[in-house]
Each structure stands twice: as C-alpha cells, then as structure tokens.
Amino acid sequence: MSPLTSATSAPNKAEILIEALPWIQQFAGTVVVVKYGGNAMVSDELRQAFTEDMVFLHHVGIKPVVVHGGGPQINSMLGKLGIESEFKGGLRVTTPEAMEVVRMVLAGQVGRELVGLINAHGPYAVGLSGEDGALLQAVRTGTVVDGVEVDLGQVGEVIGVNPGSILDLLDAGRIPVISTIAPEVGKASSVLNVNADTAAAALAVALQASRLVILTDVEGLYRNWPDKDSLISALSVKELRELLPSLASGMIPKMTACLKAVDGGVRRASVVDGRSPHSMLLEIFTTAGNGTQVFPEAGPQGEKA
C-alpha cells in the first residue's frame, strides 16, 4: 500500500503533496534514468511499486528511462539448463553458451515482464535491447584478480551511445525499458553482456538526464560498512573519488556509475534502497531524499544537495 493510500490523516497527505511540488516543478520535462535491479526485481510487491513509480513520474511530466539487468533470473535459467556460472573479481564470466542465456533472459523475459507491468497502467512502455538501433556500443573488457588480468569472455564496457531511438520514444510519450546487451564494436554479429549500472550512467550522460537513480539492496553508501551508523546521505564527486578505493566490491560498480554520470554532466546521481516500496518517489519528491546522493563540486542553485 502506498503512503498516500494508507491511514495517514488528510492534512498529512496534503503536506506530502505540497512538499513534492517544488521537486515536480524542478524535474518536469527532464529525463530521469533509473537502473532497476536487486530485490526489487524478484519481489512481486516491489515490482508493482516500481512500475507505479515509473507511471507516476510519467504523469507529472518527467521522462523516465528504465535500464535493467537480471542477475537472479540469469542465474536461475543457467541452473535449469545445467550451465555452470563462474564469477571472477565479482563479474560474471560469459561464455558463448552463457551469452545465449543472458540474451534470452534479459530481452525475452525480464524486459518483457517489466514492460507488461508498466503497460497494465496504460500503453506507455516500449522494450529495447542495447542492440536495437545500435543503441549501445561496447568493447570487450577483462578484470584484474590478485594482480593478474582475467578474461571474462563476452563481457563488455559501453564506450558509445546512439540515443536517437530513445529520444524518439520519449518525444512520443513512451517509457523506454532497456536490456543491457550491446553489440561489440567492429564485430556486428557479436554481442556482449554489459554491466547495467555503467550502462545506465552512459545513457544518462548521452540523454543529458537531470538524474540517475540506481536501485540497490542496501540503504545507501556506508563510509565504514557494516557500521550502519556510517550511512552517507550526500557527498561530492571529490569525496567519492577519495572513498572509492576503500568501498566493498559490490558497491564499486554502482558508485563508479554515479561518479561517471555526474562527471558527464548529470546534475545528481543516487543509490537508493530498492527493498523499500516507492523509494524512488521518496528520493525524487521529498526534501530529505532517500539513500545516498552524489553531486558535483559546484551544483546549480536551488537543487537538492
């Protein structure tokens, strides 16, 4: 049940709406890129809440763009098919056999389900893969484990974005839902599995988004994990650069994505707790916000900091 349909008194409901007004005015007409993942993908309640949030953003004049991964669903399908899944340095090793499953699950299952849930509220969502219209371009990348370069197979890093198809959909009043599969630069017949956090950051920069919001399975960024009293509500890109080497491995891709987005001109980037229903709305439309927000050294006046 959403906050506005609970037993909250009428005056309190009115206060919630009035508090949201300046933020609606600030973000109306702008693009907000949302990376959807984690527990929010596997809980029916959280999936429903997320799709309601996207439709709400759409109806108050904001242009949401959804970027999704699908780690839990990929793991499940690989298990059903008896294909072993290997991780090195926290990243999935994607063999040609595994890549077929990744492609099938992201574009054919997760993306379609999300489009269907959004479209239960009206004909808004359109699903795309990073392959469509050469939306994303990627090159193969490895990782370093204990000082040794490791081959990850068909894993890539986004190096280019062709945003035209997304801009056309936004102009048509649609909500793009993007699966993070990308064609390999120089090899049109080869596709790569790209990290959804970094893909979302690249899209946010290319679309000149006002916000990047990444859903995660923790309350935000902690200065001294697992000390929950060390939760950081906001920090500058300078502070994040200094903190990045000391972060837990699971947060590094997310915070690196936030850093790249803000460095690329996105006004604000946030990680929010996707385990909490409607955390997106709290982050965008309340003064206190939700989670951890990254801002530039000298942000525009009148925005959340």
Swiss-Prot record:
It catalyses: N-acetyl-L-glutamate + ATP = N-acetyl-L-glutamyl 5-phosphate + ADP. Gene3D superfamilies: Acetylglutamate kinase-like. Its EC number is 2.7.2.8. InterPro entries: AceGlu_kinase-like_sf, AcgluKinase_fam, ArgB, Asp/Glu/Uridylate_kinase, Glu/AcGlu_kinase, NAGK-C. GO terms for biological process: arginine biosynthetic process via ornithine; L-arginine biosynthetic process. Disulfide bonds: none annotated. Pfam families: AA_kinase. Pathway: Amino-acid biosynthesis; L-arginine biosynthesis; N(2)-acetyl-L-ornithine from L-glutamate: step 2/4. Catalyzes the ATP-dependent phosphorylation of N-acetyl-L-glutamate. PANTHER family: N-ACETYLGLUTAMATE SYNTHASE (PTHR23342), N-ACETYLGLUTAMATE SYNTHASE, MITOCHONDRIAL (PTHR23342:SF0). Belongs to the acetylglutamate kinase family. ArgB subfamily. This is Acetylglutamate kinase. It comes from Renibacterium salmoninarum (strain ATCC 33209 / DSM 20767 / JCM 11484 / NBRC 15589 / NCIMB 2235). The gene is argB.
